[in-house]
Amino acid sequence: FNGQTIPLVGVRVRCHHLLHFEECFTNANGEATSLGSFKQPARYKIFWEDQKYWDIRDGLTWQAKTKGPRMTGRWELVISGDTEDAMFAAIHRACRAIFHDNPFGITRPKRGRIKLCAFYKKDVGKNGDHAGITVGIWPDIRIFRKVKGNTRSRWEITSTALHELGHASHHRAVVELPGSNRIEDFVLADGILKESWARGIQFAFMNWLYPNQVNKIRPDYFENYTGVVEGLMNQGLTLKQ
């Protein structure tokens, strides 16, 4: 978004040669420092999933992963452009911000791992969607890179992921948490309420991820997608309130 190289925290990295496997998660500097050592060239792979909270899929079914080289020594990967790997990384950043960092103290979406499907080539005319109830292989969240023939950037992918995770947070707070069970309140809620809340999540978290911008990062506001949450935050209220 601002041209800086950003370390990816909490990425699952695996290194293996034959039956020798080593695995760890990247630290605050984006480094996998606990992979052990190999006498022979080893294959690197990244699996875009969290142990506890989320699982990113390549399309509907396949695990999202990045295949690295077979080599000795240190593998340095810089993800740039609008590649498929960049899409996975963009969704990962959104998940990390919501589930682990959670600077605004909102309700974490879903008990157990949430499934987010990334569609790199498929175009169905929408940025993404969230399903409160899923069956079989159907995901909780779908995110699309192409929308009506237009290709969206990494930061737009992150913003969409935050929006859909905002819906998932809303669903859990109203329906899933102990003592809530107000499914009708969620199902029958006006679209303007649901979409404006998710827009507020986008606004707050995108500006937290990319601070010190000359102008605030704002999602498009139109019809049901209003800026009421931003307005309330400007009046001193917090997202949690």
Residue ranges with predicted function:
Residues I143-A161:
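Short pre-active-site segment immediately N-terminal to the catalytic Zn-binding motif
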Residues K45-K67:
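A short, solvent-exposed loop/turn motif at the edges and junctions
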Residues H16-T33:
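Short, acidic Ser/Thr/Gly-rich low-complexity loop/linker segments typical of extracellular
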Residues T33-R43:
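Short Pro-Gly-centered beta-turn/loop motif in secreted/extracellular proteins
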Residues S159-E176, E195-R199, F203:
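Active-site recognition of the HExxH zinc-binding catalytic motif
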Residues F1-L19:
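Short, ordered, surface-exposed loop/turn motifs in non-cytosolic proteins
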